[in-house]
């Protein structure tokens, strides 16, 4: 199937098979299609609604083209990358979680990018902290093995994405590519906490990750619109564990945490985002610390360092009340230049 045939099919609201989607995506990612064809295809998919099989096939295609990072020990390997796109301008929560999870004994292969829809992307805040982002795949692997943290800058690893940059920019709408980033971690992490920008994606993405061979995953979207576990409202969860997907809702009160005001954790730039992160890692009580505890606790749970979400959050709070997470940030800044 070529992209023109695919467009004709999806505008009839007919899903593509995995094989059909793989063929079209491979043509797109290897430069065999025009910008107009890519735009028409992405809009058609968005209007029809991307199926689990279509997202699975697209992710498999991107994974086959990625510049990968090899990690020898994947037992407690996890990523906290989300889709972004919530438009709320909060500080970099998932990036902050990296240091808490590493302090708990996990290995975090953090996949991320510069700012797209937010005021500060994960790459921006890490750069503000002094982290060297220009690392080879070998250096990234060594950092993860040595200190439990590595950062994979998406444009460096997903070179084939250059073929869709202009069509996506011209369309200026959410497309399948908004969810593909977190699904295509270059280190092939078996465990993830993945935030998504819409509630309708929570359960389907859990099934996509099941199809991709993930081990333990939590996919989240909060009632107040975050692609994170919220400190201010209920959060919808789909959990993949032992090959089964279950759905449920959680609230900060479930973890004996007070509701927080999201206005307290908005960051207009990377520097202020870093300030909020450092204060929380130093144990300063408040909304930033509590939302980091919720999200890093989930990552601690899925990577096998706690046997329940509650215990994961408790472990995260204990770490935040010490200085070990901030020490991990300092370690990463230092090691990123010479490990």
UniProtKB/Swiss-Prot annotation:
Coiled coil: none annotated. Mg(2+) 1 binds at residues 94, 228. One of its GO terms (molecular function) is magnesium ion binding. Pathway: Amino-acid biosynthesis; L-tryptophan biosynthesis; L-tryptophan from chorismate: step 2/5. Pfam families: Glycos_trans_3N, Glycos_transf_3. One of its GO terms (cellular component) is cytosol. Keywords: Amino-acid biosynthesis, Aromatic amino acid biosynthesis, Glycosyltransferase, Magnesium, Metal-binding, Transferase, Tryptophan biosynthesis. Its cofactor is Mg(2+). Mg(2+) 2 binds at residues 227-228. Anthranilate 1 binds at residues 82, 113. InterPro entries: Anthranilate_Pribosyl_Tfrase, Glycosyl_Trfase_fam3, Glycosyl_Trfase_fam3_N_dom, Glycosyl_Trfase_fam3_N_dom_sf, Nuc_phospho_transferase. Binds 2 magnesium ions per monomer. SUPFAM superfamilies: Nucleoside phosphorylase/phosphoribosyltransferase catalytic domain, Nucleoside phosphorylase/phosphoribosyltransferase N-terminal domain. Its EC number is 2.4.2.18. 5-phospho-alpha-D-ribose 1-diphosphate binds at residues 82, 85-86, 92-95, 110-118, 122. Anthranilate 2 binds at residue 168. It comes from the Bacteria. It is an enzyme of class 2 (transferase). GO terms for biological process: L-tryptophan biosynthetic process. PANTHER family: ANTHRANILATE PHOSPHORIBOSYLTRANSFERASE (PTHR43285:SF2). Homodimer. Catalyzes the transfer of the phosphoribosyl group of 5-phosphorylribose-1-pyrophosphate (PRPP) to anthranilate to yield N-(5'-phosphoribosyl)-anthranilate (PRA). Belongs to the anthranilate phosphoribosyltransferase family. This is Anthranilate phosphoribosyltransferase.
């Amino acid at each position: 199937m070529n992209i023109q045939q695919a467009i004709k099919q999806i505008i009839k609201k007919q899903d593509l098979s995995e094989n059909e989607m793989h063929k079209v995506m491979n043509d797109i990612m290897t430069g065999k299609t025009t910008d107009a064809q890519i735009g028409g295809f992405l809009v058609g998919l968005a209007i029809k609604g991307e199926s689990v099989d279509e997202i699975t096939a697209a992710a498999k295609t991107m994974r086959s083209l990625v510049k990968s990072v090899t990690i020898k020990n994947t037992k407690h390997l996890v990523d906290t990358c989300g889709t972004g796109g919530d438009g709320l301008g909060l500080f970099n929560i998932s990036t902050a979680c990296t240091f808490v999870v590493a302090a708990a004994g996990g290995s975090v292969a953090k996949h991320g990018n510069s700012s797209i829809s937010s005021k500060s992307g994960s790459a921006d805040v890490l750069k503000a902290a002094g982290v060297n982002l220009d690392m080879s795949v070998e250096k990234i692997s060594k950092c993860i093995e040595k200190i439990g943290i590595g950062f994979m800058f998406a444009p460096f690893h997903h070179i084939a994405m250059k073929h869709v940059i202009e069509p996506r920019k011209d369309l200026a709408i959410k497309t399948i590519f908004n969810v593909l980033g977190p699904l295509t971690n270059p280190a092939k992490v078996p465990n993830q906490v993945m935030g998504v920008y819409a509630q309708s994606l929570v359960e389907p993405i859990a099934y996509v990750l099941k199809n991709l061979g993930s081990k333990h995953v939590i996919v989240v979207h909060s009632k107040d619109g975050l692609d994170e576990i919220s400190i201010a409202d209920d959060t919808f969860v789909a959990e993949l564990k032992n090959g089964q997907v279950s759905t449920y809702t959680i609230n900060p009160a479930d973890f004996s945490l007070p509701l927080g005001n999201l206005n307290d954790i908005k960051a207009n730039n990377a520097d202020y985002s870093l300030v909020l992160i450092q204060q929380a890692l130093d144990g300063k009580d408040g909304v930033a610390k509590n939302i980091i505890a919720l999200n890093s606790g989930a990552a601690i749970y899925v990577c096998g360092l706690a046997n329940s979400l509650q215990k994961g959050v408790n472990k995260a709070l204990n770490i935040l009340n010490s200085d070990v997470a901030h020490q991990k940030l300092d370690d990463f800044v230092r090691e990123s230049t010479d490990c």
